[in-house]
Amino acid sequence: NAALFLDLAGTLVELDDSRNIPRNSRGDLIIKLLPNVADKLAPMHDHLMLVVTNQAGVNRKWFTMEQVEDAMRALDDQLGGILTGWQICPHTPDDNCECRKPKAGMITDLAELYGVDLRASTMVGDQEVDELAAEAAGVGRFIYARDFFGWD
């Protein structure tokens, strides 16, 4: 089974000026889809779609894992329920975990869980850490979000 692995912030949803997902006064993440995301992904609803996201704000106490999970469910709702699953790394770079991109942990965990053929799969992201994680996991192809979603 081939999968489409997707980064979250800056790939699927908008960032604020400090390159974070915006939050409301309660700290809830505000999920606003970037242009063309829903239109591009909707026809691919029969593919495995797996989101992998670094969310160091959890360990920094900016927001909770529950708030990130709520945001992921809101994202899936906005996309019409087409996401197969997701993995969230709550660690900071200093934690030196195996899941935080550019390491491969989140991708390989999801691949094992869903029986994914990594070589036949694609990763879409907006940063070099996404490309490096895909490469480390053995994902067959990486495409930058601006190219995949046709942003100028």
Give the location of each predicted region.
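A short alpha-helix capping/helix-coil boundary motif
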Residues: D17-N20, V52-Q55, Q87, T108-A111
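Active-site neighborhood of HAD-like aspartate-dependent phosphohydrolases
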Residues: N1-L50
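Short, flexible/disordered intra-domain loops and linkers
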Residues: N20-P22, R26, R60-E66, D95-E98
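Asp-based, Mg2+/Mn2+-dependent phosphohydrolase catalytic module
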Residues: N1-L4, E66-G85, P93-M123, Q127-D152
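Short glycine-rich loop/turn motifs that provide flexible caps or phosphate-binding loops at active sites
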Residues: A9, A56, V124
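Substrate-recognition element of Asp-dependent hydrolases with the DxDx(T/V) motif
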Residues: V37-M72, L83, Q87-T92
